UniProtKB/Swiss-Prot annotation:
InterPro entries per record: CutA_tolerance, Ion_tolerance_CutA, N-reg_PII-like_a/b, N-reg_PII/ATP_PRibTrfase_C
Pfam families given in the database record: CutA1 (PF03091)
Cofactor or coenzyme needed: Cu cation
Compartments (UniProt record): Cytoplasm
One record GO biological process: response to metal ion
Coiled-coil annotated residue ranges, if any: none
Family statement: Belongs to the CutA family.
Function: Involved in resistance toward heavy metals.
Keywords, in A-Z order: Copper, Cytoplasm, Metal-binding
GO MF: copper ion binding
Cofactor note: Binds 1 copper ion in the interface between two trimers.
NCBIfam families in alphabetical order: dival_cat_tol_CutA
The organism's taxonomic lineage, starting at the top: Archaea, Methanobacteriati, Methanobacteriota, Thermococci, Thermococcales
UniProt-recorded name of the protein: Divalent-cation tolerance protein CutA
Length: 104
């Protein structure tokens, strides 16, 4: 099993929970960590500030393409950042649990 973490942000708790629940129901992820934080970014020529909800999704590399496309489809942002982080080390027990959840 090749575990990955996928990171994205949402404008609010409602959209973060809605998308995350859908990803869980489709078994594209095994777990999510959601956390509110302050964001600063360039948008349409000026610096913006505000609150966002960051989402860390735990999954397996074979789910990456479908997960990315599903996030794009459901995400409220015009240009969501969807980053994949490959994990070269993961404890065996967690890896085995992920496999059971994702693949039965």
């Amino acid at each position: 099993m090749e575990a990955i973490i996928v990171y994205t942000t949402f404008p609010d708790w409602e959209s973060a929970r809605k998308v995350t629940r859908e990803l869980l129901e489709r078994k594209l992820i095994v777990c999510a960590n959601l956390r509110e934080h302050e964001a600063m970014y360039w948008w349409e020529g000026k610096i913006e500030e505000g609150k966002e909800v960051g989402a860390i999704y735990k999954t397996e590399v074979s789910k990456w393409k479908e997960l990315r496309e599903t996030i794009k489809e459901l995400h409220p942002y015009d240009v969501p950042m969807i980053a994949r982080i490959d994990l070269d080390k993961l404890n065996r027990e967690y890896s085995e649990w992920m496999a059971r959840v994702l693949f039965g």
